[in-house]
Regions:
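Conserved core of the PLP fold type I
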Residues: 66-167
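Extreme N-terminal starter segment of soluble prokaryotic enzymes
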Residues: 12-15
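Short, Lys/Arg-enriched N-terminal segments with co-localized hydrophobic residues
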Residues: 1-10
Length: 167
């Protein structure tokens, strides 16, 4: 590493894989919306309070012994409840220890899904336009995103373009 004046150390450049990433388009649009007082339709900003029953229960459990991180894939009782609900809703036999994982949000869920199925140098079809994380998730998994355009006005894909993407 090179030295700067007064003994400072120059930090290593960021990795090559990060060179194609930019700031979040969604967050950039949020800043613009806020600047002009526009209504932000891009993120979940509810303009109402949670139901009182939920607030009351949260207040109760804050004083109980549930103040530690759950296991990585989610608390057992929560996964059991999700498996029971989704089994009924989806008409499937779901095992809470094999078929259910709890994440901090959709971004983590999508990344976990991509990391579960992608190996380095795999090809991943990404329809374009796309949610900004799809291409980045592929790259971070070591896969190569292959962009296939969706055509307005109904944003259908062209069958030949999709077939060519697999070649």
């Amino acid at each position: 590493m090179q030295k700067m004046k007064k003994g400072s150390v120059i930090m290593k450049e960021l990795s090559k894989r990060t060179e194609t990433f930019t700031d979040s388009v969604i967050r950039r649009m949020t800043r613009i919306a806020n600047e002009y007082g526009a209504i932000n339709l891009s993120q979940g900003f509810p303009d109402f309070d949670p139901p009182q029953e939920i607030l009351n229960r949260l207040s109760e459990v804050a004083h109980e012994d549930f103040n530690q991180y759950a296991i990585t894939w989610g608390a057992q009782n929560f996964r059991d409840a999700l498996a029971k609900k989704q089994s009924k809703y989806m008409n499937l036999d779901l095992d809470s220890n094999k078929n259910i994982v709890v994440t901090c949000g959709s971004t983590e869920a999508m990344m976990a899904a991509m990391m579960s199925v992608c190996d380095p140098s795999d090809k991943v079809i990404v329809f374009s336009p796309f949610y900004e994380n799809y291409g980045a998730d592929s790259i971070l998994c070591g896969a190569d995103p292959i962009y296939v355009p969706l055509h307005p006005p109904v944003f259908n894909f062209d069958k030949e373009e999709l077939e060519n993407a697999f070649k």
